[in-house]
Amino acid sequence: MSMEEKQNFQISQDFSASTIKPNSEEAIAEAIKYCYKKNIPLEINGLSSKKNIGKNFQSQKTLDLSNYSGVIKYEPEELYIKVKSGTSIKEIKEELDKKNQQFAFEPTDFGFLFSGMSNEGTIGGVLSCNFAGPRRFKVG
């Protein structure tokens, strides 16, 4: 993208806070555009369950997706569920349990390692880190 195109992004929200908590796709896109336009390093978080894995990231702003969660559509008979990226693994499992269904993979829970308690994180974190777990080889 050229500098001219970058400067032509239209930003309609105030992003002065260090943590941005959008609750819609439009607000997420706006935040990313804003940081891109201003060359601001942006960290994306859900429940921070994988924050201690890998190299530390120095960011000026955090895009917190914990407000962007929930089941959009669930069709148990089709084995289909559509959720927002900030939806917790726990919430999805609870929804699947109602129809005696389960994941065909096993997301790794690093919570016990870092905090001593369960924190499986969000579906966005699982997919973006490719932490589908060991069961995916057999059933995923």
What are these model-predicted stretches?
Residues 103-140:
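A gly/ser-rich beta-alpha-beta helix-loop segment of oxidoreductase catalytic cores
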Residues 1-2, 85:
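Generic secretory/membrane-interface signal
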Residues 3-19:
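Generic N-terminal amphipathic, Lys/Arg-enriched alpha-helix
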Residues 7-8, 89, 139:
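Broad hydrophobic/π-residue packing in well-ordered secondary structure
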Residues 2-7, 64-68:
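Short amphipathic beta-strand starts and helix->beta connectors
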Residues 14-110:
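Glycine-rich N-terminal segment of FAD-binding domains in flavoprotein oxidoreductases
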